[in-house]
Swiss-Prot record:
One of its GO terms (biological process) is protein localization. Coiled coil: none annotated. Belongs to the 14-3-3 family. SMART domains: 14_3_3 (SM00101). This is 14-3-3-like protein RA215. GO terms for cellular component: cytoplasm. PROSITE patterns: 1433_1, 1433_2. PANTHER family: 14-3-3 PROTEIN. Pfam families: 14-3-3. InterPro entries: 14-3-3, 14-3-3_CS, 14-3-3_dom_sf, 14-3-3_domain. It comes from the Eukaryota. It comes from Solanum tuberosum.
Length: 254
């Protein structure tokens, strides 16, 4: 007979196939709540996918609504703007709740129970990601605090990754990708973003012959995203000041 942990993991897989990600989160939260040993690679990936989909839908909604709000403001439609602001605030409350949920799990259970280099980097990267999502829409002191927490988590992850993971390791590459996006999108620091992305890409290219079959696809995909962002950011920096809609940066697991 399956243990409660095995049953919840099984049901999380079922929920994923049915694309019912809120329930997938609930099943994986039960696994984490009863945690007596570190999550397996399968379990931590399920947790990540569940939260990625739950947060991703709302981040997309927030971007669309913010864009509509800007258009209505430029047209002077004050009544519409007031309604949209209220609607945007509702989505921001949902985003805050989701981010706080996973951040609490990471701080109370997951980071402390991580025993290997790759799991430590995985969870610290995740912590940085969800603080970054908060920084995307928070303002003032809350935004500053979220950005500082993002930077701290990513730097802690980077220190471990550089010491314990190969330059081609997909988790190390994914961290470099998201960290560079944070520099570009949140801190408005294109030079640091480009330097970090280029260094990660160059180090991985130099080591690419050592890639095993199992991680080849994941690693080369992230390397391509790093290169795409470098191309995009370099182009944006050259065109700075041009009045055009800019293509969003690409991040890992988003």
């Amino acid at each position: 007979m399956a243990s409660p942990r095995e049953e919840n993991v099984y049901m999380a897989n079922v929920a994923a196939r049915a694309e019912r990600y809120e329930e997938m989160v609930e099943f994986m939260e039960k696994v984490v709540a009863a945690l007596d040993t570190e999550l397996t690679v399968e379990e931590r990936n399920l947790l990540s996918v569940a939260y990625k989909n739950v947060i991703g839908a709302r981040r997309a909604s927030w971007r669309i609504i913010s864009s509509i709000e800007q258009k209505e403001e430029s047209r002077g439609n004050e009544d519409h703007v007031a309604s949209i602001k209220k609607y945007r605030s509702q989505i921001e409350n949902e985003l805050t709740s989701i981010c706080n949920g996973i951040l609490k799990l990471l701080d109370s259970k997951l980071i402390g129970s991580a025993a290997t280099g790759d799991s430590k980097v995985f969870y610290l990267k995740m912590k940085g990601d969800y603080y970054r999502y908060l920084a995307e829409f928070k303002t003032g002191t809350e935004r500053k605090e979220a950005a500082e927490n993002t930077l701290s988590a990513y730097k802690s992850a980077q220190d471990i990754a550089n010491g314990e993971l190969a330059p081609t390791h997909p988790i190390r590459l994914g961290l470099a990708l998201n960290f560079s996006v944070f520099y570009y999108e949140i801190l408005n620091s294109p030079d640091r973003a480009c330097n970090l992305a280029k260094q990660a890409f160059d180090e991985a290219i130099a080591d690419v012959d050592t890639l095993g079959e199992e991680s080849y696809k994941d690693s080369t995909l992230i390397m391509q995203l790093l290169r795409d962002n470098l191309t995009l950011w370099t182009s944006d920096m050259q065109d700075d000041g041009a009045d055009e809609i800019k293509e969003p940066s690409k991040a890992d697991n988003e």
